[in-house]
Amino acid sequence: MAFYPLQIAGLVLGFLGMVGTLATTLLPQWRVSAFIGSNIIVFERIWEGLWMNCVRQAKARLQCKFYSSMLALSPALEAARALMCVAVALSLIALIIGICGMKKIQCTGSNERAKAYLLGTSGVLFILTGIFVLIPVCWTANIIIRDFYNPAVHVGQKRELGAALFLGWASVAVLFIAGGLLCGFCCCNRKKQRDGYPAPRPSMPRTDERRRNMTRQSETPTSYV
């Protein structure tokens, strides 16, 4: 199977995208406190994530608290949780399928076509993972920016984009590249297999053979004794 380095690059990037997706899901720095106007309190930072909020004060340790009630969460936060959990599961499944489709792995024997289809499926799942990560990250960023410029929102309630959002965007880019590499490998492998088999030569019909034989016989001069 050709393009073996392409397989390695796609799976390595997919693994990095999976790690980035998991880190984005767990990190609390989705929304961080904004220091604007009269809210310049630099010795206290507030982080809000999908699962917990944290307060970090000067000369004090970081204190984090999980959200106590599921019913008290906003619909946007619940949807972001669900999408990120699905993204983590999809990335793990994509990585396992991609490993099974590797050249050196004998899960499918020596069937190159089956291995190519497995790698193509892995690439599609990595792209789907990127989409599932992109939706909550962009959604949350849109809410933060909208509230930041909304004069009706109190200054103390305004938030800025946290590091987890930037990590999520980077993970989406890596997942898209990984999926593109694996899908491209699958397409190239199918094209190579299709071009590798020569087209069968058309067989001459029997009627044409008989007609040619009759023509030759008629052209042969007849000798008379």
Curated annotation (Swiss-Prot):
<keyword id="KW-0812">Transmembrane</keyword>
<keyword id="KW-1003">Cell membrane</keyword>
<keyword id="KW-0868">Chloride</keyword>
<keyword id="KW-0472">Membrane</keyword>
<dbReference type="GO" id="GO:0005886">
    <property type="term" value="C:plasma membrane"/>
</dbReference>
<feature type="transmembrane region" description="Helical">
    <location>
        <begin position="165"/>
        <end position="185"/>
    </location>
</feature>
<feature type="transmembrane region" description="Helical">
    <location>
        <begin position="8"/>
        <end position="28"/>
    </location>
</feature>
<dbReference type="GO" id="GO:0005254">
    <property type="term" value="F:chloride channel activity"/>
</dbReference>
<keyword id="KW-0813">Transport</keyword>
<comment type="similarity">
    <text>Belongs to the claudin family.</text>
</comment>
<dbReference type="InterPro" id="IPR017974">
    <property type="entry name" value="Claudin_CS"/>
</dbReference>
<comment type="function">
    <text>Channel-forming tight junction protein with selectivity for anions, including chloride and hydrogencarbonate, and for solutes smaller than 9 Angstrom in diameter. In the kidney proximal tubule, may be involved in quantitative reabsorption of filtered anions. Does not affect water permeability.</text>
</comment>
<keyword id="KW-0796">Tight junction</keyword>
<keyword id="KW-1133">Transmembrane helix</keyword>
<keyword id="KW-0869">Chloride channel</keyword>
<dbReference type="Pfam" id="PF00822">
    <property type="entry name" value="PMP22_Claudin"/>
</dbReference>
<feature type="transmembrane region" description="Helical">
    <location>
        <begin position="82"/>
        <end position="102"/>
    </location>
</feature>
<keyword id="KW-0407">Ion channel</keyword>
<feature type="transmembrane region" description="Helical">
    <location>
        <begin position="125"/>
        <end position="145"/>
    </location>
</feature>
<dbReference type="InterPro" id="IPR004031">
    <property type="entry name" value="PMP22/EMP/MP20/Claudin"/>
</dbReference>
<dbReference type="GO" id="GO:0005198">
    <property type="term" value="F:structural molecule activity"/>
</dbReference>
<feature type="topological domain" description="Cytoplasmic">
    <location>
        <begin position="186"/>
        <end position="225"/>
    </location>
</feature>
<dbReference type="GO" id="GO:0160187">
    <property type="term" value="F:paracellular tight junction channel activity"/>
</dbReference>
<feature type="topological domain" description="Cytoplasmic">
    <location>
        <begin position="103"/>
        <end position="124"/>
    </location>
</feature>
<dbReference type="GO" id="GO:0007155">
    <property type="term" value="P:cell adhesion"/>
</dbReference>
<dbReference type="GO" id="GO:0070160">
    <property type="term" value="C:tight junction"/>
</dbReference>
<keyword id="KW-0965">Cell junction</keyword>
<dbReference type="GO" id="GO:0160184">
    <property type="term" value="P:paracellular transport"/>
</dbReference>
<comment type="subunit">
    <text>Does not form homotypic polymeric strands and it is not sufficient to form tight junctions by its own. Interacts with OCLN.</text>
</comment>
<keyword id="KW-0406">Ion transport</keyword>
<dbReference type="GO" id="GO:0034707">
    <property type="term" value="C:chloride channel complex"/>
</dbReference>
<feature type="region of interest" description="Disordered">
    <location>
        <begin position="194"/>
        <end position="225"/>
    </location>
</feature>
<feature type="topological domain" description="Cytoplasmic">
    <location>
        <begin position="1"/>
        <end position="7"/>
    </location>
</feature>
<dbReference type="GO" id="GO:0005923">
    <property type="term" value="C:bicellular tight junction"/>
</dbReference>
<feature type="compositionally biased region" description="Polar residues">
    <location>
        <begin position="215"/>
        <end position="225"/>
    </location>
</feature>
<dbReference type="GO" id="GO:0070830">
    <property type="term" value="P:bicellular tight junction assembly"/>
</dbReference>
<dbReference type="InterPro" id="IPR006187">
    <property type="entry name" value="Claudin"/>
</dbReference>
<protein>
    <recommendedName>
        <fullName>Claudin-17</fullName>
    </recommendedName>
</protein>
<feature type="topological domain" description="Extracellular">
    <location>
        <begin position="29"/>
        <end position="81"/>
    </location>
</feature>
<feature type="topological domain" description="Extracellular">
    <location>
        <begin position="146"/>
        <end position="164"/>
    </location>
</feature>
